[in-house]
Amino acid sequence: MGVFNFEDETTSIVAPARLYKALVTDSDNLIPKVIDAIQSIEIVEGNGGAGTIKKLTFVEGGETKYDLHKVDLVDDVNFAYNYSIVGGGGLPDTVEKISFESKLSAGPDGGSTAKLTVKYFTKGDAAPSEEEIKGGKARGDGLFKALEGYVLANPDY
């Protein structure tokens, strides 16, 4: 099995606590409201903490598909959240799982700095393609910006 790491960092004008609430605490309800392609997020097993399995149902190319996410860490105090895609349509044939480690911290002017590490655990020596990496980054950036936009548009959130 190969492991390929990618890191990304971005900033937001939204404070870490408000952004974490949208990205993690309320995400199961908020994401389907904000992202048209995502129909639902439901807990299949667990209570929302580490070890929980979530099913994310989405529409892609006119087809309904799903991903299974396993929650690896929920740290509400330090604004950290880790999960892995462990099944469903979001995994390329050459990948066993994709893990995401995210952390929000105080950024400039009362905003946030978001750090993300993505690990592809591949079958054999296969490496993720540049297309897979770029596609995953684009989806992640889109989700982040959509939830950030929701928080900015709803000051009482």
Curated annotation (Swiss-Prot):
GO cellular component, one term: nucleus
Domain of life: Eukaryota
Keyword match Plastid: no
Key words, A-Z: Cytoplasm, Pathogenesis-related protein, Plant defense
Database matches in InterPro entries: Bet_v_I/MLP, Bet_v_I_allergen, Plant_def-hormone_signal, START-like_dom_sf
GO annotation, biological process: abscisic acid-activated signaling pathway; defense response
Subcellular location: Cytoplasm
GO MF entries: abscisic acid binding; protein phosphatase inhibitor activity; signaling receptor activity
Up-regulation conditions: Upon contact with the plant pathogen Pseudomonas syringae pv pisi and salicylic acid.
Pfam families (alphabetical): Bet_v_1 (PF00407)
Presence of the UniProt keyword Cytoplasm in the record: yes
Tissue expression summary: High levels in roots and not detectable in hypocotyls, cotyledons, stems, leaves and flower buds of untreated plants. After induction, high levels are present in the vascular bundles of leaves.
Record-stated family: Belongs to the BetVI family.
UniProt-recorded name of the protein: Class-10 pathogenesis-related protein 1
Taxonomic lineage: Eukaryota, Viridiplantae, Streptophyta, Embryophyta, Tracheophyta
Annotated gene: MSPR10-1
